Each structure stands twice: as C-alpha cells, then as structure tokens.
Amino acid sequence: MKDFTLILAIIAIAILALISCSSSKKTQADTRSDVALAPQTIVPDTFVLPLIPEVLTDPGERAAYLLSHFWDRFDFSDRELIQRPEITEQAFVDYINILPSVSREEGDRSLMYTLGKAASDTMFYRHFATLFEKYFYDPNSPFRNEEYYLPLLQQFVQSPLLQEEVVSRYAFQLDMALKNRIGQKSNDFHYTLESGLTFSLYELQSEYTLLMFSNPGCPTCEAVMAQLNSSKPLNDALAMNTTSRTMLAILNLYPDEDITAWFSYLPQMPARWINAYDKEMEITRKKLYDIKAIPTLYLLDKEKKVILKDTSIEAIESFFSVVH
C-alpha cells in the first residue's frame, strides 16, 4: 500500500507539472486556433499522454483539455493491451486521479468521452466497465466515488456491448446508488432498542444524526467505534446536547438477524449512543440502504437529508470541525 501511495504521489507531481506552464501573450483567437490544430497521433503498444497546446496556460484549462483528450493517442484496436495492466490499468488510474481537478460537469463529459473511446471495441468497453466498477464502486477502493459512477451506470444498463447478466448487475447497482443520495431525504426505517421499544428514524429529533450500520464483534466495526468514541469533533458536538435540544445523535444500527450476538455485545457499545437493531429486517428486505461493507456511515441533517453518504470518519470529523 505504501508503494502504491508513492506511485500515486509521483503521478500527481507529474500531472501538476504537466498542467502548469508559463504565461503566454497569444490572443484568445490565436489560442482557439492553436488548440484546434494540436496533433494527437496514436502510439501503439504503450500509453502516451496527449499533447497539451502550449497556449493553454491556465492549470484548470490544461486539466480540462487533458481529460477531454486523455485517450486520443491510445490504441483501442489492440486488445493485447487489455492484458497489460502496467499500461492500460495504470493509465486508467492516472486518468481518474485527474478528475477532481475539474468541475463535475467537465468530469462527466470526460467520462462519457472515455466510454465513447472504449466503445470502439466490445472487449475494451467491457474491460473499462470493469475498471470503473473496481475503482468507483468497490468499498475498498481509495477512488470510490458514487457520483462519478452514476452516469456510467446509466450508460451501462443501456449498452448492447455488455452481457445480459452484467447489465443486470449494473441495473441493481444503479437502483441502489439512486437511494439516499446526498441532498435527498434518507429512507425511513424502524429500529428497536434493548428495552424492546421501537422507533422510526424520522422520529429521532436532532440537528444531526450519524447513522452507523455495524455488526457485533466485527473487528473493523470495533476500530471505527473506538475512533468515533474518542473523536474530539464528535465529542464536542455531543457535549452540546441538552434536555431540550440534541445537537448530535449517533444511531448505531445492527441490520442483520443474530439478535443473540447483538445483545451479548451490547455492553461494549458506547453508552451515549443509540444502540439498536432492525427487528423486522426491514432495511434488508426492502433494500432501503446500499450497505456494501460493514461498517457503513451516513451523516444526516435535521430533516434527515443526506449530508455525507457511505463516508469516512475523516470526512465526518472535518464536517463537525468546520460547523462547530
């Protein structure tokens, strides 16, 4: 992992150097002309970055140009490159590493451009679909990004280049990804406490709700619970709770069916949290939330709209550090 991080750091430095350059005194008309004439020759058996016109001096414009021409010199007719991850997959990782440098609209246009390039060959299209799934959807991917993945899924489910069973998988992913999106109201569900009392998420009155799906005894869950429980930004928010106003409620929900294990583990859960289980397995039965891995974290506002979806502890702490 350290080697992988080092590689990404080197890539980032190289890309920063690529998209930055000295100023130019050419007019806007000259710039448009020179950009239009920039040659992009396909180079076989390797990956070569596109030539960025020197007249583009703004780093944002250079990044946008790079993303909109990233694959222009790549030979999509050579299927042997699919079996060369040191070329194709490495170039793909370089590509998605640049996406945050531009606006979401420009990023989406670039993603569609990439799919269009890959669609020139069925096997390449399928390979790129797999890479997008691996890097944007896999819960363990450092590039995981549902907002980038959504427009791709919308294309995959309509593509005649993918096998029927693959389209079905992407259709399911699309259905789940469209639920509980950032800015939208989260799905309601019922949770049951140790006492046997049952409430709904929407009944929970708090300025913010940290929703955590976890399993008893799960090592990763234990680590996340410990980190959340000792988090200064979260503890500062919890300290603002009063009898008349709740700033932050942490709802730690067990979504599975081994209630005996949950009760056994309950004494180890933070007492200040709302520790509960899904008695009727409602979340699983109705597919209310996309729980790709355990634990999964959501941050909701007062109206139960999603602020952060399937997020990290760092993002949650950053939010409360700014807000409070």
Question: What annotation goes with each model-predicted range?
Answer:
Residues 1-8:
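Bacterial N-terminal signal peptides that target proteins for export
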Residues 18-20:
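C-terminal motif of bacterial Sec signal peptides marking the signal peptidase cleavage site
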Residues 23-197:
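Oxidative protein folding and maturation machinery
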Residues 190-209, 234, 240:
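A short beta-strand-turn-helix
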Residues 200-230, 249-251:
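Short active-site neighborhood of thiol/selenol oxidoreductases, capturing the structured segment around
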Residues 225-267, 281-285:
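Structural microenvironment flanking redox-active thiols in thiol-disulfide oxidoreductases
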Residues 263-298, 302:
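Short, internal strand/loop/helix patches
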Residues 293-296, 302-324:
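Non-catalytic, surface beta->alpha helical segment in thiol-disulfide oxidoreductase systems
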